[in-house]
Swiss-Prot record:
Its cofactor is [4Fe-4S] cluster. Pathway: Isoprenoid biosynthesis; isopentenyl diphosphate biosynthesis via DXP pathway; isopentenyl diphosphate from 1-deoxy-D-xylulose 5-phosphate: step 5/6. The keyword Oxidoreductase applies. Keywords: 4Fe-4S, Iron, Iron-sulfur, Isoprene biosynthesis, Metal-binding, Oxidoreductase. It is an enzyme of class 1 (oxidoreductase). The keyword DNA-binding does not apply. [4Fe-4S] cluster binds at C265, C268, C300, E307. Pfam families: GcpE. This is 4-hydroxy-3-methylbut-2-en-1-yl diphosphate synthase (flavodoxin). It comes from Bacillus cereus (strain Q1). Converts 2C-methyl-D-erythritol 2,4-cyclodiphosphate (ME-2,4cPP) into 1-hydroxy-2-methyl-2-(E)-butenyl 4-diphosphate. Binds 1 [4Fe-4S] cluster. Belongs to the IspG family. The gene is ispG. GO terms for biological process: isopentenyl diphosphate biosynthetic process, methylerythritol 4-phosphate pathway; terpenoid biosynthetic process.
Amino acid sequence: MTHRTKTRPVKVGNLTIGGNNELIIQSMTTTKTHDVEATVAEIKRLEEAGCQVVRVAVPDERAANAIADIKKQINIPLVADIHFDYRLALKAIEGGIDKVRINPGNIGRRHKVEAVVNAAKERGIPIRIGVNAGSLERHILEKYGYPTADGMVESALHHIKILEDLDFHDIIVSMKASDVNLAIEAYEKAARAFDYPLHLGITESGTLFAGTVKSAAGLGAILSKGIGNTLRISLSADPVEEVKVARELLKSFGLASNAATLISCPTCGRIEIDLISIANEVEEYISTLQVPIKVAVLGCAVNGPGEAREADIGIAGARGEGLLFRKGQVVRKVPEEIMVEELKKEIDVIAAEMAAEREKEKETQEQ
C-alpha cells in the first residue's frame, strides 16, 4: 500500500497537503469570478458545508483583479485556475492567491513559466500541475496512440521537471480522466513515480446521481490503496453537493475526523414510523457538524439498539414511541411526536462535548 504520510508536505494557505493521512476536501465555484459578491456568497456556502480549499476560474483580467477582494472575505485557501495566459497567474499571485493551478505545457515559452514560478516562489505559493487525459500533449498522443496512464505520468514528470529545473518543489499533481479505470491506473503509477502530493478527481463525471456513483467507484478504489492527499468530486450540480459527497466518501474510509455520520436501516414491512423522512431530516441536521459523531435512525425497536451499538446516539422507532439509545444502551423511551426533537437535543450535547474535548487536546499539544 502507498502511504499518504510518505508524500512531500506542501503548504496551501494555513493548511498542509501531503505528509500526513488527512485528505483535504476541495471544490470549485460556478460563479463568474469577477462578480465578487456572488463568488464570495457561494464560497461561504461551501465553507459551511465543509469545503477546505476552493478554486476559482481566472479566464481574464477582470477575474484576476477580483482575487484580492475575494480573499479578504473568505476563511479558506483560494486557488486560481489558469490556462494559457501566464500574466493572469502573475496577477492572481499579486492579489494574494494561495495556490495556482496551471498546465506548464499550455502557459507558453520557458520565460513565461519561469516568471510564474519565480513569483510563486517569492510568495511561498504552491503550484498544482493539472494533467488531464483529454488534453495531453501532441507528442505524447503520437507516442502512445491515445490517452494512457503511462502517457499521463510521462506528461506529469515532464512538467515536474520544468519546475524542478527552476528549483521549485512546492508542487501538487492531479491525474484526471473521465474514464474510471484509466484514472485509477494513472494515480497508481503516479504514486510510484514521485512523492509530490496527489490531488484526486474523476473529471467530467456527470450529474449529481451518475457523477456521485462514478466518482465513488474511481476515487474509492484509489483511496483504498492509500493514495491521495486532497480531492474534488466533480459534478454537474451545486458545488455544495460536491462537498457533501466528498465528506461521505472520506467517512466510508475512516478518513474524515471532522464529519458526522448517519446510520439508518433499509426499510421493511416491520417499520411503523416514517423512517425515510426522519432519516433525511436528521442527515440534514448533522450535515454541517465538524465532529465525528455517529447518529443512528432505525425503524425497529426490537433489534435496533443492538444493531447500531457503535452509534454515539440514536433512535429506534415503534408505533407511538421510540427508544433513545447511546452506544447500544437504551437511555429512555420518548413519545413518537417528539422523538426527533429529543434526538437533536442529545446530538447537540454530544457534539458540544466532542468539540470541547478536541479543543482541550489541541491546547495540550500546543503546550
